[in-house]
Amino acid sequence: MAVVSKKIPAPDKVQVKTALLSVFDKTGIVELARALSEKGVRLLSTGGTHKAIAAAGLAVTDVSEVTAFPEIMDGRVKTLHPKVHGGLLAIRDDAEHQAAMKEHGIEGIDLAVINLYPFEDVRKAGGDYPTTVENIDIGGPAMIRASAKNHAYVTTLTDPADYSELLEQLSADAGQTTYDFRKRMAAKAFARTAAYDAMIANWFAEALDIATPRHRVIGGVLREEMRYGENPHQKAAFYVTGENRPGVSTATLLQGKQLSYNNINDTDAAYELVAEFLPENGPACAIIKHANPCGVATGPSLVEAYKRALACDSVSAFGGIIALNSILDAATAEEIVKLFTEVIIAPEVTEEAKAIIARKPNLRLLSVGALPDPRVAGLTAKTVSGGLLVQNRDNALVEDMELKVVTKRAPTAQELEDMKFAFRVAKHVKSNAVVYAKDGQTAGIGAGQMSRVDSARIAAIKAEEAAKAMGLAEPLTRGSAVASEAFLPFADGLLSAIAAGATAVIQPGGSMRDQEVIDAANEHNVAMVFTGIRHFRH
């Protein structure tokens, strides 16, 4: 049975007479304390916050003087006391509460300014287990929740950005706060503690390798509100979860306008793809449009990798996202600015490249500092009506797979390299996906078709168009390897690829008609390997 409310109406305005200040982030706290003191507000504080306020020459009472109980256990216990929580939770207009306060010597607290131990920062910095645990705040969330629950009478501030609005209210209304303000701050406070607890719970789940905990909460901090979402009629915002994975959420915007919803989605897809190509194996470039690659290539230099990626589908690349696995240099920047591009993302950018990109002030340039490790899984989430689908990120790499040759002819060394390249790209193409590749360059990409045969045909058409644009006599698919991100259910998909000129095929295998497909490959002297790993992408 639910707890029954006495339904005492909340007052519109409450006089702030006593404030409790206990913060880890001391940004603006001394200035706030001084302004409150000048308005006649009694200040209570704890630990380092008390020291900072007292050092500024302000009158402040240590909470231990109020509780008559010292701070103990390295600060783990200092505010968990009835005289603190009673002062925060007491309903001022309830006679029984007032009697209890009088009997136990509890003074009301009208303002709670609290922020928390930096658990997120310690986790992000890779702190060891004991240090991370020690930075789980207990007293802070308890006080925030207590004061926010009693927002009818108590104002709760958890963000230094709200200090100025509080002071404006107090100045405009003879030291009082409005119910609307208290309610808004309470909502913000509960959102803060919810996100904080979610990060802790998720950290424990990761540490214990629990993929499906009984309760899964994905918390985030608002990074920015956007003009609109995927379409102009949709509202949107970008939240960061604190996951320590290099990418669009950790990148620095060196120039250009605010990233849009679609920019962020596409840039994330681009950077995750290019991270599959380790820098020690050479420069690589991926060009993305609508979260699908339209060209991916490696090269002896970064500028050559970009040129080769662009050549795969220069028409679709217009207005796309460019992701690089190496430092963006001047030569590559000079080529990129020749084409309209929405976003460039790279681990680093040289000063010369920055100056060149600056010629296009609307071009968004992101520097990340590192590439994400493609072998680290992490979590991905997708909302459905009334639910949340959560899974480990697809961290299966073709380099780690046991490739099984299933045809009479084994692939040549070059075909095997082309197979791996194509399968690496196919992992990042919307299903059904078919990718042709040759000599470290995509030759044609077929994405998102309901029929795998149609994806193969589209990829072949793209290859023909690219060959014509490059002035080549035959399509890029001649002598190429072809990858399918899922098994070929019938021989028709294979025959379509063979007709386009492919001589080697890589696919997961596992169809009831595998033998039919293998027989067709043998009949045409095509080499085929099974990976045993599927890469569906929806």
From Swiss-Prot:
Q: In which pathway does it act?
A: Purine metabolism; IMP biosynthesis via de novo pathway; 5-formamido-1-(5-phospho-D-ribosyl)imidazole-4-carboxamide from 5-amino-1-(5-phospho-D-ribosyl)imidazole-4-carboxamide (10-formyl THF route): step 1/1; Purine metabolism; IMP biosynthesis via de novo pathway; IMP from 5-formamido-1-(5-phospho-D-ribosyl)imidazole-4-carboxamide: step 1/1
* Residues annotated as transmembrane: none
- Domain named MGS-like: which ranges? 8-158
Q: Gene that codes for this?
A: purH
Q: Which UniProt keywords apply?
A: Hydrolase, Multifunctional enzyme, Purine biosynthesis, Transferase
Q: What is known of its domains?
A: The IMP cyclohydrolase activity resides in the N-terminal region.
Chaperone found in the keyword field: no
- What is the scientific name of the source organism? Rhizobium rhizogenes (strain K84 / ATCC BAA-868) (Agrobacterium radiobacter)
* Protein name per UniProt: Bifunctional purine biosynthesis protein PurH
